[in-house]
């Protein structure tokens, strides 16, 4: 008998089953507090998963965001997708999560599927240093271009001084 508790088995929801039926390897993470299905996707399968979901009607990227799991742990890029249609009171939603190592934080850009990813991916890059490969204009959006580091990482050390330049 093991002293470590076993993780509960989480059954795939409707979106997870759809992706599995398309031979896309994903892991169900259950549902969030709002009841939205959450799915973990490897970064090398992200574009195939997103193209499948777009073809299935998930036509709106409500939010792309990122967070830091903690010092020495993974960075996470998240995608909240919705099927928008006429007269939908509660449209289907899903949240995709891609976990990447902080020493190699690369994820394919979904800009070419949902244009709303443009500034959202840039913000995640600017704050966490996640590189969205294939993004047409991946550069800082909030911090000065010469800023060193990624301010929302939990291991970020704030500089004592930063000299602002005069605007002309």
UniProtKB/Swiss-Prot annotation:
Membrane topology: Peripheral membrane protein
Assigned EC number: 7.1.1.-
Cellular-component GO terms for this entry: plasma membrane-derived thylakoid membrane
Gene Ontology annotations of biological process type: photosynthesis, light reaction
MF terms in GO: NADH dehydrogenase (ubiquinone) activity; quinone binding
PROSITE patterns to which the protein is assigned, alphabetical: COMPLEX1_30K (PS00542)
Catalyses which reaction(s): a plastoquinone + NADH + (n+1) H(+)(in) = a plastoquinol + NAD(+) + n H(+)(out); a plastoquinone + NADPH + (n+1) H(+)(in) = a plastoquinol + NADP(+) + n H(+)(out)
Record-linked InterPro entries: NADH_DH_suC (IPR010218), NADH_quin_OxRdtase_su_C/D-like (IPR037232), NADH_UbQ_OxRdtase_30kDa_su (IPR001268), NADH_UbQ_OxRdtase_CS (IPR020396)
Annotated compartments: Cellular thylakoid membrane
Keywords tagged on the record: Membrane, NAD, NADP, Plastoquinone, Quinone, Thylakoid, Translocase, Transport
Domain of life: Bacteria
HAMAP family: NDH1_NuoC
Family to which the UniProt record says this protein belongs: Belongs to the complex I 30 kDa subunit family.
Assembly and oligomerization: NDH-1 can be composed of about 15 different subunits; different subcomplexes with different compositions have been identified which probably have different functions.
Known role: NDH-1 shuttles electrons from an unknown electron donor, via FMN and iron-sulfur (Fe-S) centers, to quinones in the respiratory and/or the photosynthetic chain. The immediate electron acceptor for the enzyme in this species is believed to be plastoquinone. Couples the redox reaction to proton translocation, and thus conserves the redox energy in a proton gradient. Cyanobacterial NDH-1 also plays a role in inorganic carbon-concentration.
Protein name (database record): NAD(P)H-quinone oxidoreductase subunit J
């Amino acid at each position: 008998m093991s002293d470590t508790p076993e993780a509960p088995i989480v059954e795939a929801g409707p979106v997870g089953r759809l992706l599995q039926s398309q031979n896309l390897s994903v892991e169900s993470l259950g549902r969030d507090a709002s009841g939205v299905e959450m799915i973990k996707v490897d970064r090398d399968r992200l574009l195939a998963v997103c193209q499948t979901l777009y073809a299935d009607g998930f036509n709106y990227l409500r939010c792309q965001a990122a967070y830091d799991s903690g010092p020495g742990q993974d960075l996470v890029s998240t995608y909240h997708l919705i099927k928008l249609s006429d007269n939908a009171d509660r449209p289907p939603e899903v949240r995709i999560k891609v976990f990447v190592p902080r020493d190699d934080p690369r994820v394919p850009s979904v800009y070419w599927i949902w244009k709303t990813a443009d500034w959202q991916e840039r913000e995640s890059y600017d704050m966490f240093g996640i590189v969205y490969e294939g993004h047409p204009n991946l550069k800082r959006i909030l911090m000065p271009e010469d800023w060193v580091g990624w301010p929302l990482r939990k291991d970020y050390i704030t500089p004592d001084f930063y000299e602002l330049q005069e605007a002309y």
